[in-house]
Amino acid sequence: MAGSTIELRGLRREFPSGEATVVALQDLDLTIEPGEMVAIMGASGSGKSTLMNILGCLDRPTSGSYRIAGRETSSLEADELSALRREHFGFIFQRYHLLPALSALGNVEIPAIYAGQPGEARRARAGELLARLGLADRSGHRPNQLSGGQQQRVSIARALMNGADVILADEPTGALDQRSGTEVLQILDELNRDGKTVIIVTHDASVAARAKRVIELRDGVVVADRLTSPEAARRAGDAPTRQPPATPRWNWRREYDRISEATRIAVLAMAAHRLRSFLTMLGIIIGIASVVFVVAVGDAAKRKVLADISSLGTNTIEIFPGKDMGDVRSSKIKTLVAADARALAQQPYIDGVTPTVSTTSTLRYGGLEANALVNGVGDQYFDVKGTKLASGRFFDASGLRDIVQDVVIDEKTRQTFFADVAGGAVGKVILIGKVPCRIVGVMQQQQSGFGSNQNLSVYLPYTTVQARFLGNSSLRSILLKVSDTVATADAEQDVTRFLTLRHRVKDFVILNTDDIRKTITSTTGTLTLMIAAIAVISLVVGGIGVMNIMLVSVSERVGEIGVRMAVGARRSDILQQFLIEAVVVCLIGGGLGVGVAFGLAALFNLVVPMFPLSLSGTSIAAAFVCSTGIGIVFGYLPARQASFLDPLAALSRD
């Protein structure tokens, strides 16, 4: 079976024109053997261009049969026709149809990209073809830097890139001067001598005279089919035959090359419309920056809240007199006493216990005085609260027993009374009300939060405060540290049962810091989610902007799509091309959005140093995942529209 024989039998092509039908080709019977050089002539409207489009698998006949290498084309799917165009045919167009964003070398490479040739081999062959056609020194030039003749030679090199054995030339000299036209025809002669089947569509008799066989059309009918040289009859069929290739199997390297090329084209397309690309990205930039920044603020707020809660102590519960929080009669309930604390200390689920009492008084030292909160606490208070000392020591159990007048002061008190005192505060005697107390320790500074306030605070043994300041034995509260092996909720239930039995009535209320932590963490998370959801709206708006611009890009690049399909791009290749472009736009926008979020976080940290923000790797990774997802979701419709364009219609609109 002749691998390259072209056979037309009863071929007919009709086009609708309003309510009428225009017949472009009528019942053509035609055979073109391998190695022939054929000119198809005819006046405008004779059907010669329609015939060439059908021969090149850019169009389908209305009826009849078109067989290439014995294979009926009417039954082939779109991708199978793409494979024929990619490997079997080479197109030379009157208007060149070179992609303006690519160099001469890049234009020649295009068919090989879709054929899956490796990058190095592809570039080497493209360079060889350009050198063969006298364009070695112009391989890096773009089409607008080349003359018409040079552009047509680039088009010829592109047609030869995949080793096509049928060259279809549509008015190859129509846009050239005489000299350039002659050079192009000489190249076609050489290709024919090399065994290529060359089919030239022309209305110029002098061009047709270069062919060995001339087919003349009139009103869609062959009116003449003659040989111009006896040699042509002998040479026809002598060319090596070749079976049309099957669609290549999937190969990861070929796919990588295609994706790399699509990414490069995407960047070039963006560079060609910088302002439009930036405005397209703006919605993505704002959306990603908002989401990442809001998540960072939410995380920082959560950390701050948890740190403030920790100032109440870790895994702690606190017992207050009263039937519930806010009980107005709680001050009259005197049943919460130190004996309760000692009894609770014996329970296995408790790691530490401290009674607490409090009052206010005036501090005096060296002519200075200030009001302060006087806290009476147990010797385990500082461990339960996780408090650390800047200097000195805490008082111990013997101090409670002996009702010592030792005091631990906070950092605010030190700054107020002892900032300029030589030797510091430890060891000095400060007057609290009328009671002289020796300073034994200074606490580290604590951030303001749940466990602190702006008042000065001092800490004495609770027995001392009861005896010297209050004159009674009741407690303000009992603070418990729950064992790490016990859930605070379980401990709370056990303490409730224990004290209820001990008091014979529930005259106390328990504050569980773990409940506070959970509530505030949940609230913070909800607020963060709500604000992030608002920020996501801008992402959706940005995605719609990407879709709109991609639709505009498709409409502007219809000609490019037609060229890519003509040289063998499958629908999936076109879909992939525009999807990748949408994803690249969104990824760059996402990267810029993350950069903006970093800038906002840095500015925020300068303005509010007590509330530091840090961007998490998770939120950044999520930002890029969102960017990719937006590109795919909102880029799919334009990409699909591009992939379903008819190659002939796309070329005609260029």
UniProtKB/Swiss-Prot annotation:
As for subcellular location, the record says:
Cell inner membrane
What the entry lists under CDD domains is as follows:
ABC_MJ0796_LolCDE_FtsE (cd03255)
An example Gene Ontology molecular-function term:
ATP hydrolysis activity
Where do transmembrane segments lie in this chain? 278-298, 527-547, 584-604, 619-639
What Gene3D superfamilies has UniProt attached to this entry?
Answer: P-loop containing nucleotide triphosphate hydrolases
**Keywords of the record:** Antibiotic resistance, ATP-binding, Cell inner membrane, Cell membrane, Membrane, Nucleotide-binding, Translocase, Transmembrane, Transmembrane helix, Transport
- To which protein family does this belong? Belongs to the ABC transporter superfamily. Macrolide exporter (TC 3.A.1.122) family.
Q: What's the protein name? A: Macrolide export ATP-binding/permease protein MacB
